[in-house]
Every structure is written in C-alpha cells, then in structure tokens.
Swiss-Prot record:
UniProt catalytic activity: Ca(2+)(out) + K(+)(out) + 4 Na(+)(in) = Ca(2+)(in) + K(+)(in) + 4 Na(+)(out)
The protein's role, per its UniProt record: Calcium, potassium:sodium antiporter that transports 1 Ca(2+) and 1 K(+) in exchange for 4 Na(+). Critical component of the visual transduction cascade, controlling the calcium concentration of outer segments during light and darkness. Light causes a rapid lowering of cytosolic free calcium in the outer segment of both retinal rod and cone photoreceptors and the light-induced lowering of calcium is caused by extrusion via this protein which plays a key role in the process of light adaptation.
Keywords for this protein: Antiport, Calcium, Calcium transport, Cell membrane, Ion transport, Membrane, Potassium, Potassium transport, Sensory transduction, Sodium, Sodium transport, Symport, Transmembrane, Transmembrane helix, Transport, Vision
UniProt membrane topology term: Multi-pass membrane protein
Protein name as it appears in the record: Sodium/potassium/calcium exchanger 1
Family: Belongs to the Ca(2+):cation antiporter (CaCA) (TC 2.A.19) family. SLC24A subfamily.
Chain residue ranges for the region called Disordered: 1-251
The keyword Calcium is assigned to this record: yes
Amino acid sequence: DPGSQGVGAEAENTGERTGGEAEAPAEGENGERSGGDAALGGESEGKAENESEGDIPAERRGDDEDEGEIQAEGGEVKGDEDEGEIQAGEGGEVEGDEDEGEIQAGEGGEVEGDEDEGEIQAGEGGEVEGDEDEGEIQAGEGGEVKDDEGEIQAGEAGEVEGEDGEVEGGEDEGEIQAGEGGEGETGEQELNAEIQGEAKDDEEGVDGEGGGDGGDSEDEEEEDEEEDEEEEEEEEEEEEEENEQPLSLEWPETRRKQAIYLFLLPIVFPLWLTVPDVRRLEAKKFFVITFLGSILWIAM
C-alpha cells in the first residue's frame, strides 16, 4: 500500500497518460526520458518495517520523445528499441513490467513499478524487478546494452555481471552476449568463421593443385599414346614400301592392260627417255619435244 510508506523516497513521474493508458518513466514507447541524477543522501527515512533513517531525494525530469532514457549515477544501459533507452545505476538490477508498472524500492529490497499507480520508489542497494512483454534489460556497472529485437547480455569480461548487479536481457528471437570493450561472443564467432573459411580456402587450393597435377599427367599420357601411334604408322608404311614391286615395262597379260599400255607407251617412253632425272642425262635436251609430243598424243 503506497499510503503506508513514508515520504523518504520521492519520485516525480513524468509519464503521460493518454486514453486511460499510462506510459512508464522507465520505458516509454516512442518517448525519450532523461532523468536527473539520483543523489543518495543517507539512508531512507520514514520506511515502514525496520527502515533506517536517511533522505533519498530522487528527481526525474523527462520529455516524451522518440526514445526514453533514464540516467542514474554509476552506469549506463542504452537500448535501441522503440520502447526507449534505460540507463541503470551501479549495484542494482532493473527490470520493468509494463503490464503492472509497479516500482517499489527499499534499502536492500526489491523495487517494482506500477504504471497505473505511477509510483517509483528507489532505495540504496535495491533491485528493480519486472517482466517486459517483449524483453528484459538488466545492466550492471560499465556495461552498455543495445537491443533492436534480440536479447543482449552485457557486463565486464563478456559476462552479465557488474560490480554489484547482473545484466540480463531476454527476448524470443535470440541472445547476444557482449563483454566490456565491444568484444563478445559474436566477435569470437566471426573470428572463428573467418579462420574456418581461410582453412577451407587453403584446402581447396591444395586440392586444386593436386587436380592440376593430375590433369598434366593425363595430358602427358595422351601425348605418349599419339607418339606411339605415329611410330607404328611409319613402320607400317616402310614395310609396305619394301614389299611393293617396282614399275615394270613388260607387256601385260590381259587385253585391257595391253590397251592401256599401248596408249601410254608413246607418252611414257619419250618422257622416260627425256625426263631430266632419268639415267640418260644426254637425252634431256629432247625433253621439250617429247613433252609436247605426249600432249599431242593425249589430245589425239
């Protein structure tokens, strides 16, 4: 019951309500909230049930713009979601429940926020818990969380643990864990993928060289086969030339061959006598006469 609690933790809710719906200061759809520093001036006073004395004035100033932002002393949580940016302080967990919207805080306790009631109570060393419909953003000291659709878990040394808190984000589509300094599992995965790709390229290169060597050996085998075939053909031609009978000027036995012989004799005999490459070199001067006579004989 908010009435039973003291005035020790004050908060100015800057959320606007339109059509009976309240927008939470922690997260506003299409709104940007810049909250002032929460000065911890001691222990909270007026708290029911064993609360220590102290003043925790919390001032909140915010303008409803495209992104909501809450800055607290000691750390930042930036979410690039449509719902806004949340920057959370050192040593605490922040979880928002849009449905219930309750934020209650006590020293060493839990804080729940209710958008309908518009109450925000923050305590030193406390926790803020809630369930968002689309996701949870929890941030620790020195970690930045940027979310578009998936879950980002950020913290020192690639874990979601801050100095006194944890950073956890959960959404249905996936998880991304990032460490301080911009290095995380995604970077390691990319490096592993690059290394594997280079190894595959090297293997393919080795395979390609082996394939090239195999192709060269096949070409050499084909050339050897062609050379063997050519040698065999030459040997066969030589054998045929040796087995051939020389041209004979003897009278043929068949009448057909005899007729051809008689027809060619006036041409062949003078040419045989007068051709320059024949045995009788002295008759080469008559070559012109015999050549013209052979032409006339053929014409007749």
